[in-house]
């Protein structure tokens, strides 16, 4: 009860009741004290004239006045708190002193009832919370269920809609739980969500009081079997017909405008029923017979790096290596995996405090699947290994038993075996003769020079791409980044979209050849300058006096150490033995050469005087006995014996090939003379000048 001092209307010009109350008491005491003081003074002054009865009489009168004041305060009307439907109404001092009037006038009550009845018919959707309190027993639960049905019938008489599901269109939530501590509930709780969405949350007592104020007699409804429903409106009829079909037919029969799913299906729809269903798919059983060609994606087995919805048919999940690897991994992570399952399972909250894994796995839900269980697969392999071991042991015992039987019967069959051995010795050649024949063949073969056999081609470290053979990936690390990638192409790649209009752009035939950059980079350009192509030209002169010039070109292996050159002086030395045969002599020069791809050696020109009759014939023949890789070139030079002695050696005409040396940064007239000069040799012998190209070669060799 609120104290009277807080409810009284105060004025700054008037005393309040509280002040009066305290002041009156103080005044009474002061007056009494004053009278006593007066009495004492009078007594002191008129000690002889007064009597004892006078002060007693006046003190009794004052005591009576005090008692009357106390009785007046008790009879004062207390300030009361009046309640109405809108809320608490504070009654002032003036109204409190008067007789208590009705809280709400009949006119206000009628307006309130008509407004709420309109609201109930128009847009009220009521949801009854089915969650019970933990402490509620079975008797109270059945009692609350009956009361819930009674409240539903009461709201139906007002024309309100009762929804079976909670959604955002609900306006009132009626629950049997306590409404005081809603903020302590979880965010997913219905009461908490209703409070956040500004819905009304009522208890059963408040709902019953609300219906009573709307003149709904719940006692009468509890006695009658069926509730008197409100008059149906057109909107309600259309809504019910849309949901349940027309009223002139059986609602339990199938409807033509509704598709009923019979087989496995996917139905994705809007929970608020605002939008039409997004996905509706259904598959018949005949469409699901082939597991490899299912109409919907499923997880398939495959190696790492593969899409799990595509899988790999060549992937053997039941192989021994994979089973052992998977079993060891699952065994090591079993405890942690079960703890994760217990954490993420909604009804396993009570199992988190348990220490043993067996207690946690009791109430866990495992989804059935068709994948291979590592434990079962490992046990199968162990059983097969045990069977194979038993078979090998039995085979060994059988072999030993057979050997024992043979040894037992060996003595009995000695004569027969000796006869059979004699017959075989007569038919087959002796072993000694075979050994002698093999030794003789080996000695004869050692006499002839044997050709060295070529080394076997090394096996490739990587599989051949043409076969696309699957390799075992168990021993390969899972980190694919550790593998070496293929080396880059030796030339620069042409930029995307670049195409020249000159002849270079169309010089690749059908256009399928590799494209190269038309503009060389600075690094490649500087490296190409260090290379010099030694292309020596050949001058051919025709004289008036029948001068013949012959060009002899032979290919040989060129290196820094030795170069084979065909010189005219070498031919002149072989001229002496040919004089004895006659006037005309022939010098035969045979050279065996291998057709290797090396640059041609500088050709030599041989010129003879007009007085000397020389015939030079060059014939190249291939001997049938020679190998395919070698050819014999017969150079026959016919000289006149009389003029051979007087013939002078012809001077070589030096071919001047001028240019610019990028290394020495010097112009030269002859390349042959420049490469022998001291300046060029000092540059060529310094290894620091070739450090860049050496590193490039090492990198290319490493990638190959």
From Swiss-Prot:
Coiled coil: none
The keyword Hydrolase appears for this protein: no
Cited PROSITE patterns: ZF_DBF4
Region of interest called D box 2, as start-end residue ranges on this chain: 62-70
Listed GO biological process terms: cell division; chromosome segregation; DNA replication initiation; mitotic DNA replication checkpoint signaling; negative regulation of exit from mitosis; positive regulation of DNA replication initiation; positive regulation of kinetochore assembly; positive regulation of meiosis I
Keywords: Cell cycle, Cell division, Chromosome partition, DNA replication, DNA-binding, Meiosis, Metal-binding, Mitosis, Phosphoprotein, Zinc, Zinc-finger
Impact noted for substituting residue 680 to C: Weakens interaction with ARS1 origin DNA and MCM2, but not other known ligands
Entry PTM: Phosphorylated by CDC7 and by CDC5.
Description of what induces expression: Cell cycle-regulated. Protein levels increase as cells begin S phase and remain high through late mitosis.
Residues given in the record as Zn(2+) binding sites: 661, 664, 674, 680
A GO term for molecular function: protein serine/threonine kinase activator activity
Positions of region (D box 1): 10-19
Region listing for Disordered, in residue ranges: 397-453
Modified residues (Phosphoserine): 59, 84, 235, 623
Zinc fingers, DBF4-type class: 654-703
Basic and acidic residues: bias regions: 397-417, 424-438, 444-453
Classification via InterPro entries: BRCT_dom_sf, DBF4_BRCT, Regulatory_Dfp1/Him1, Replication_Regulatory_Kinase, Znf_DBF, Znf_DBF_sf
GO cellular component, as recorded: centrosome; chromatin; chromosome, centromeric region; cytoplasm; Dbf4-dependent protein kinase complex; nucleus
Motif POLO box domain (PBD)-binding positions after renumbering to this chain: 83-88
Known function: Regulatory subunit of the CDC7-DBF4 kinase, also called DBF4-dependent kinase (DDK), which is involved in cell cycle regulation of premitotic and premeiotic chromosome replication and in chromosome segregation. DDK plays an essential role in initiating DNA replication at replication origins by phosphorylating the MCM2 and MCM4 subunits of the MCM2-7 helicase complex. DBF4 recruits the catalytic subunit CDC7 to MCM2 and to origins of replication. DDK also has postreplicative functions in meiosis.
Description of how the protein assembles with itself and partners: Heterodimer with CDC7 to form the DBF4-dependent kinase (DDK) complex. Interacts (via PBD-binding motif) with CDC5 (via POLO box domains). Interacts (via N-terminus) with ORC2, ORC3 and RAD53. Binds to ARS1 origin DNA.
Protein name: DDK kinase regulatory subunit DBF4
Organism expressing this protein natively: Saccharomyces cerevisiae (strain ATCC 204508 / S288c)
Gene this chain is encoded by: DBF4
